[in-house]
């Protein structure tokens, strides 16, 4: 990977990770991990929109999609929160909400991107 490409991914990833860290402050032990859920849903929606506007492989795509969206979303934290949930019911609700919500947000993002520009 070229240094320029790696640099834009790293910069975008840092920004996405900072946003995820800030959103994680909304997680509470009593509720679903709303911060992580929000980060993952926003990332899916944004990636869907970006897929309609940006050419894959371009520096802007690498920055926004691989970097920001990649740093914002988190599969490992999602799985950790699933196995750490206090009940099977809470874990199930979180899993279904995350997966179905992510799919719906991605589809919505793709449609919004096509509707408004690409």
Mark where each language-model region is.
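Membrane-interface helix-loop junctions in multi-pass transporters/channels
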Residues: 1-118
């Amino acid at each position: 990977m070229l240094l320029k490409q790696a640099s834009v991914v790293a910069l975008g990833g840092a920004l996405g990770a900072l946003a995820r860290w800030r959103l994680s402050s909304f997680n509470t032990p009593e509720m679903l991990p709303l911060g992580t859920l929000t980060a993952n849903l926003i990332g899916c929606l944004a990636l869907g929109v970006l897929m309609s506007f940006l050419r894959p492989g371009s520096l802007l795509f690498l920055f926004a999609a691989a970097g920001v969206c990649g740093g914002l979303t988190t599969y490992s934290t999602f799985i950790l929160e699933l196995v750490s949930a206090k009940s099977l019911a809470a874990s199930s609700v979180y899993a279904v909400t995350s997966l179905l919500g992510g799919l719906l947000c991605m589809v919505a993002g793709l449609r919004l991107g096509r509707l408004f520009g690409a």
